[in-house]
Design a protein with these regions (language model features):
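Mid/C-terminal beta-alpha module of Rossmann-like enzyme folds, strongest
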Residues: 194-273
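Conserved Rossmann-fold NAD(P)-dependent oxidoreductase catalytic core, especially the SDR/UDP-sugar
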Residues: 90, 101-150
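SDR active-site strand-loop-helix element
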Residues: 7, 32, 82-83, 121-127, ...
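Non-catalytic, hydrophobic alpha-helical segments
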Residues: 13, 159, 204-208
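Conserved glycine-rich Rossmann-like NAD(P)H-binding loop of the short-chain dehydrogenase/reductase
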Residues: 25-39
Length: 273
């Protein structure tokens, strides 16, 4: 039975991945989060499965808790790195922290068990960081979108660069979707050359699971996207709000303290899902 580790299980993408995996059945899910109660409250599928440890195990703690992360990753066939925040927090480093925590944990586990099977890593990023995925987006619009999420994109770029530097012993894939929205699953396709907005979190999750299940190496250290295969996904109107506030936090980062969704972190740490 395959085992999947989800880092950031209380976030929008993390919850969707947990739901997709549990709905599919015949697998074990290790869900890492800062708050077990939040996960069970926001993800009914997790609440239903939590009593059956053969299906779901929840690991609550901090990313720098080596024991928690090691236990979460031990025996995993794939690891989803979807630790994230939703707005343009200055100084955000949650993606970098997660990448370093996973790599350090796998090194510890490999030292303890030489020759162990290493999981495939699937990291959530953004189509805005892959120019070839945004060929149909006007340059001015692309600039606005990148600027409105500048702090988060700097974090994602750092995490991706770090994971790519591990390509001599780890396999990672960087999933870069377009604009995301809470909606039903409409069907998905993993795509190598373009992104599409809007895309539901459930369709994104299904695509990320498909990438994680691939064993022939076609996605090794590649950037991919996920696109819907049917019409009807609603437009992510909340993205307009986050674009406006994101521009504010880019040009006037001090305003985040008063208008941001999260407490500002110390310089070396940011709050995670």
């Amino acid at each position: 039975m395959p085992r999947y580790a989800v880092l950031g299980a209380t976030g929008n993408t993390g919850r969707a991945i947990v739901q997709v995996l549990l709905d599919r059945g015949s697998c074990q899910v290790h869900a890492y989060c800062r708050s077990r109660e939040k996960l069970l409250r926001l993800c009914p599928a997790a609440a239903d499965a939590e009593c059956d440890r053969k299906r779901l195990s929840v690991f609550q703690g901090r990313l720098d808790d080596n024991r928690i992360i090691d236990d979460c990753l031990r025996g995993a066939d794939a690891v989803f790195l979807v630790v994230a925040i939703v707005d343009n927090m200055p100084g955000c480093t949650v993606a970098i922290q997660a990448a370093h925590a996973v790599v350090a944990s796998l090194r510890r586990l490999q030292t303890a068990t030489p020759g162990m099977h290493l999981p495939r890593l699937v990291m959530l990023s953004s189509a805005s960081l892959e120019p070839s995925f945004c060929g149909d987006v006007p340059a001015a619009v692309h600039w606005v979108l990148k600027t409105a999420v500048s702090h988060l994109y700097k974090d994602l770029e750092g995490a991706e660069a770090f994971l790519r530097a591990q390509d001599d012993w780890l396999s990672a894939t960087f999933v870069k979707p377009g604009g995301l929205v809470h909606d039903h699953a409409f069907g998905h396709q993993v795509c190598l050359d373009r992104a599409q907005t809007p895309l539901s979190f459930l369709d994104l999750a299904a695509g990320m699971v498909e990438v994680a299940d691939n064993v022939d190496g076609r996605y090794h250290m590649r950037s991919v996207s996920v696109i819907p295969t049917a019409q009807g996904t609603r437009f992510p109107w909340d993205g307009v709000y986050y674009t406006m506030t994101g521009l504010l936090f880019h040009f006037l980062p001090w305003t985040y303290r008063f208008l941001g969704d999260y407490p500002l972190p110390p310089p070396e740490r940011a709050k995670t899902d």
